[in-house]
Amino acid sequence: MNLETIIGLEVHVELKTNSKIFSASPTEFGAEPNTQTSVIDLGYPGVLPTLNKEAVNFAMKAAMALNCEIATETKFDRKNYFYPDNPKAYQISQFDKPIGENGWIEIEVDGKKKRIGITRLHLEEDAGKSTHTADGSLVDYNRQGMPLIEIVSEPDMRTPEEAYAYLEKLKSIIQYTGVSDCKMEEGSLRCDANISLRPVGQEKFGTKAELKNLNSFTYVQKGLEHEQVRQEKELLSGGIIQQETRRYDEATKKTILMRVKEGSDDYRYFPEPDLVELYIDDEWKEAVRASIPELPDARKARYVAEIGLPAYDAHVLTLTKEMSDFFEATVADGADAKLTSNWLMGEVLAYLNKQQKELKDVALTPAGLSKMVQLIEKGTISSKIAKKVFNELIEKGGDPEEIVKAKGLVQISDEGTLRKVVTEILDNNGQSIEDFKNGKDRAIGFLVGQIMKATKGQANPPLVNKILLEEINKR
């Protein structure tokens, strides 16, 4: 029996508003526990929620960027459940009238494009955060009442790789809109995954398992890969799959049962009596639509069509708005686009990944990178020397020209000076000359290396190659 994998994702994104969705409490990350709460957040008797209009604007903006249809009439509902991090014993969410429906995004895996449907996008409030220790459990209510959007995909993904690509694309689009920073490490983006298997050709879905506590996109992919294997073994051996909630354990690289899954009826949804229905007219919709900036796909297409970048470069540069904006500012300052792209995708990304930092955390500026790239273009420094300048720029900042002067890194491009060095190297390496003349091309690389060593890497490489061949041919 051949089985087909069915995957759907539920993504919660914390909106970057200045206050919470139903109260004036601040939303700053990292504050002392229970210092950013109010009687509204904690559900004191007699208090009433007030809807944050900016949260609605942000939700609409995200929904539009995800190609959703925006509701004209929407409302809020109570999702009833008791848990220590939910002091009201209900969560204000949206049940049957979400703010956005029927959206989609396009992903690409192994060179093949695929459209993934988005069932709905709705607004809701976040719960508090529980911390469990050996001595007991603690609850921080700072997160209680934070504005969230939940984005529910269609079950259109067929592999864990497609799920990973969907999350990357979704995160990129949301970051471009500016409604959230989507930092998983700070909890502003969280993902639950639903996975089931069914015989190929069968229309009815199999029984699904929901995966929670997925702390990175990599964990989402790994958790789905393991669950895919687990369910396949169970079904092929004649067993059945229970509808349950599981978590991915990185230590064992397995999914572990948490609880038998509840259905939506268990939450006893009913309309929120303290909030009126919300009417969104065309004027409001168009005002929000006008605020949506250029999104990653459009920017990627522009980089290829107008700037002339290869498709791969355009893809990498537009994955995050931070990198894309940095690239644009560098090129606008006069740097060559392709050379800038090479540095950003090479040295810059390598440094950021190694140091686990973002561009905003380092001293490198678009103006600094632009000036360094222009020094390479003019032949003032070589690419090899530029790496020394780059290390200084990204660690300490400064003016590339001043760094070059202070460290004596100006490229040697005087033909007379280089010819003397080349002649001396050839005089001491007669065997390498013979090897080259006998067809051993590697000998030329050795000689170039000796010349670069003698000039401390400051010789102009193209000029060195030219003079070297001229001098060898004289002998």
Swiss-Prot record:
Q: Which UniProt keywords apply?
A: ATP-binding, Ligase, Nucleotide-binding, Protein biosynthesis
User: Which GO molecular function terms does the record list?
Assistant: asparaginyl-tRNA synthase (glutamine-hydrolyzing) activity; ATP binding; glutaminyl-tRNA synthase (glutamine-hydrolyzing) activity
Catalytic reactions on record: L-glutamyl-tRNA(Gln) + L-glutamine + ATP + H2O = L-glutaminyl-tRNA(Gln) + L-glutamate + ADP + phosphate + H(+); L-aspartyl-tRNA(Asn) + L-glutamine + ATP + H2O = L-asparaginyl-tRNA(Asn) + L-glutamate + ADP + phosphate + 2 H(+)
Q: Which residues cross the membrane?
A: none
Q: Which domain of life is it from?
A: Bacteria
- By its UniProt entry, which InterPro entries does this protein fall under? Asn/Gln-tRNA_amidoTrfase_suB/E (IPR017959), Asn/Gln-tRNA_Trfase_suB/E_cat (IPR006075), Asn/Gln_amidotransferase (IPR018027), Asn/Gln_tRNA_amidoTrase-B-like (IPR003789), GatB (IPR004413), GatB_C_1 (IPR042114), GatB_Yqey_C_2 (IPR023168), Gln-tRNA_amidoTrfase_suB_CS (IPR017958)
Q: What class of enzyme is it?
A: ligase
Q: Which GO terms describe its biological process?
A: glutaminyl-tRNAGln biosynthesis via transamidation; translation
Q: Which family is this sequence assigned to?
A: Belongs to the GatB/GatE family. GatB subfamily.
Q: How does it assemble?
A: Heterotrimer of A, B and C subunits.
Job of this protein: Allows the formation of correctly charged Asn-tRNA(Asn) or Gln-tRNA(Gln) through the transamidation of misacylated Asp-tRNA(Asn) or Glu-tRNA(Gln) in organisms which lack either or both of asparaginyl-tRNA or glutaminyl-tRNA synthetases. The reaction takes place in the presence of glutamine and ATP through an activated phospho-Asp-tRNA(Asn) or phospho-Glu-tRNA(Gln).
In Swiss-Prot or TrEMBL terms, this protein is called: Aspartyl/glutamyl-tRNA(Asn/Gln) amidotransferase subunit B
